[in-house]
From Swiss-Prot:
UniProt xrefs under SUPFAM superfamilies: Terpenoid synthases (SSF48576)
Induction section of the entry: Expressed in the late phase of the viral replicative cycle.
Recorded catalytic activity of this chain's protein: isopentenyl diphosphate + dimethylallyl diphosphate = (2E)-geranyl diphosphate + diphosphate; isopentenyl diphosphate + (2E)-geranyl diphosphate = (2E,6E)-farnesyl diphosphate + diphosphate; isopentenyl diphosphate + (2E,6E)-farnesyl diphosphate = (2E,6E,10E)-geranylgeranyl diphosphate + diphosphate; isopentenyl diphosphate + (2E,6E,10E)-geranylgeranyl diphosphate = (2E,6E,10E,14E)-geranylfarnesyl diphosphate + diphosphate
Protein known as: Trans-prenyltransferase
Keyword DNA-binding applies: no
Domain of life, source organism: Viruses
Pathway entry: Isoprenoid biosynthesis; farnesyl diphosphate biosynthesis; farnesyl diphosphate from geranyl diphosphate and isopentenyl diphosphate: step 1/1; Isoprenoid biosynthesis; geranyl diphosphate biosynthesis; geranyl diphosphate from dimethylallyl diphosphate and isopentenyl diphosphate: step 1/1; Isoprenoid biosynthesis; geranylgeranyl diphosphate biosynthesis; geranylgeranyl diphosphate from farnesyl diphosphate and isopentenyl diphosphate: step 1/1
InterPro entries for the chain: Isoprenoid_synthase_dom_sf, Polyprenyl_synt
Coiled coil: none
Function: Trans-prenyltransferase that catalyzes the sequential condensation of isopentenyl diphosphate (IPP) with different allylic diphosphates, such as dimethylallyl diphosphate (DMAPP), geranyl diphosphate (GPP), farnesyl diphosphate (FPP) and geranylgeranyl diphosphate (GGPP), farnesyl diphosphate being the best allylic substrate.
Molecular function terms, GO-annotated: (2E,6E)-farnesyl diphosphate synthase activity; dimethylallyltranstransferase activity; geranylfarnesyl diphosphate synthase activity; geranylgeranyl diphosphate synthase activity; metal ion binding
Amino acid sequence: MLHLIYISIIVVLIIILISYTRKPKYFRITAPRSVALFHGIHPLNPKNYKTFSKEFETILNNAIEDGDFKGQLTEPCSYALRGGKYIRPIILMEIVRACQLQHSFGAPIYPAEAALAVEYFHVASLIIDDMPSFDNDVKRRNKDTVWARFGVAKAQMSALALTMQGFQNICRQIDWIKEHCPRFPDPNQLGALLCTFVSHSLNSAGSGQLVDTPEKTIPFFKIAFIMGWVLGTGTIEDIGMIERAAHCFGHAFQLADDIKDHDTDTGWNYAKIHGKQKTFDDVAQSLQECKKILHGKKIFTSIWNEIFQKVINVALGT
């Protein structure tokens, strides 16, 4: 009888042990999505800029439908997010795609949540930048700015909601990786690193807005480049070089914008100080340095030619 009890206890312990080992070795820190953001989208297929832009629009629409923004802030946040070029999320998604052609974590990584995060952060900064206490702009993307359409209070709260939701999206991205990519190395540590880095970058962007310098532009490209690299490789190696590439690209982007705004800017403007030709030469030089780094890390793909051309087109006013 005693032997039967021992055997029964052992059997129960074995069942418990097997059940435990079959449980997912992760815990969620965010609520799961009620809709698939990327239904019908495959992250490893090569894409041009137009295709990527349409895919991100689908992701964005699904996220809004899933309730990323609630109550009275749904309309102003959705309004602010429509009609962008989506260059930052496209850069992030393409870096992840290019990295995965060299690395595999058991399943393709869909960086939809991270792509949303970088766009949310960027758009939040635009809302603040347009406010009466900053640039006092009433038009952006050929429509009323958020504060001009919905009022200052809702604009402020919308910028806050976008920023908070951006951090939620980063956490959701880490949860998704833990669930779908079992060979991804220590996603919790990388999630903490990303949140810390993003916080630092947003602080830099905020400081740049206060004095109207390029530091309000470059940090968002750093977020896109570095999040793409870390999510695509699963490592923090070479972050310094990727950050340098992001700085070069962001610098070129800002200089191109300064050329475009040469005749209308009332604040600090590089092209006004150094002249349009010198500024254009610096744009080309910065893009060339960015290209060299991306080539060195084997993540320069054909879509970068389109992305670089868009920067050149801004400078040319075309």
